Amino acid sequence: MCDDEVAALVVDNGSGMCKAGFAGDDAPRAVFPSIVGRPRHQGVMVGMGQKDSYVGDEAQSKRGILTLKYPIEHGIITNWDDMEKIWHHTFYNELRVAPEEHPVLLTEAPLNPKANREKMTQIMFETFNAPAMYVAIQAVLSLYASGRTTGIVLDSGDGVSHTVPIYEGYALPHAILRLDLAGRDLTDYLMKILTERGYSFTTTAEREIVRDIKEKLCYVALDFEQEMATAAASTSLEKSYELPDGQVITIGNERFRCPESLFQPSFLGMESCGIHETVYNSIMKCDVDIRKDLYANIVMSGGTTMYPGIADRMQKEITALAPSTIKIKIIAPPERKYSVWIGGSILASLSTFQQMWISKQEYDESGPGIVHRKCF
């Protein structure tokens, strides 16, 4: 970017984490939990500067005395007041910028309701007075980040997973599939199976501990049955984890039983297909001529695709479903946790993109509906 141009802000609002930074950077400056916390108790000490709400890391660190809420559920914003708090926190506390001076690129879940995009647009222009904004689909940005224009993206975050086939830069909406199974469900499942082991995790604060156990110790088995047998026969797969109070817990087959539910949702009592079948079904909804290109470009993105072993297992499962002659390639870049944000950073700094922004002037003339004409 040249210096006389002002850098655009890129904000990827995930159900679990908000990623924010400046277009042209190679990684987000700020990554914090999409959480708003409110005190459960009455403040008694005067002059402590107690607030009526806390956002992000501060809410996380004071979680013992707060009730934590996530304003984004299953990838879709459900609580606009809290969402506004998160955006305010993003601009003023994390990035320390004045939003009225920068174009803002926001991301949205595939198949986001139309009213939601309008509301996002309205808040950006009316509450934050942004000079320009744009809303991009998360999975499309992940594909940009991998340097492709054609492929199928499996984007699995904290609140929702999607398979989005994209051909020459266009998402194919009729073939997008959504799976309400993602990181948060896996955390809840891990809480459940650890409870069966005799460890009790119940509160919203303890759930965050379990999330940490999941991120540090879980992995995907290449062959689940065989791994279960190994775990039963020896202690080679056991790992220990120290809780904040110093208590040490041991976790064995839970390490791979938890993420196995991505491939077998029946573990969670869900009747849906696993992520491998969902990818396959999504490809099968596309035109027969482009399937070959999709099989050869299966791109993983989002935090829930970070488990060790997930790409190999995916390769194995898709190979079993697809025609035998077809070449299957799984792309799982190491930075895939942030690939939506990175794609946004790339897009917002392209010279060809500059005419795509919705300007404040266009918004004032046409109203929130402008977002459907300019962002597709």
Curated annotation (Swiss-Prot):
Propeptide residues? 1-2
Q: Where in the cell is it found?
A: Cytoplasm, Cytoskeleton
Q: GO terms for biological process?
A: DNA repair-dependent chromatin remodeling; mitotic cytokinesis; ovarian fusome organization
Task: Return the broad EC class.
Answer: hydrolase
Keywords per UniProt: Acetylation, ATP-binding, Cytoplasm, Cytoskeleton, Hydrolase, Methylation, Nucleotide-binding, Oxidation
PROSITE patterns, alphabetized:
ACTINS_1 (PS00406), ACTINS_2 (PS00432), ACTINS_ACT_LIKE (PS01132)
Location of Tele-methylhistidine modifications: H74
One function term, GO molecular function aspect = hydrolase activity
Q: Record's GO cellular component, any one? A: actin cytoskeleton
> Which positions bear Methionine sulfoxide?
M45, M48
Q: Which residues carry this modification: N-acetylaspartate?
A: D3
Q: Which reaction does it catalyse?
A: ATP + H2O = ADP + phosphate + H(+)
Question: Per its database record, what is this protein's job?
Answer: Actins are highly conserved proteins that are involved in various types of cell motility and are ubiquitously expressed in all eukaryotic cells. Multiple isoforms are involved in various cellular functions such as cytoskeleton structure, cell mobility, chromosome movement and muscle contraction.
Supply any other comment: In Drosophila there are 6 closely related actin genes.
Name of protein: Actin-87E
What species is given as this protein's source? Drosophila melanogaster
The opening ranks of the lineage are: Eukaryota, Metazoa, Ecdysozoa, Arthropoda, Hexapoda
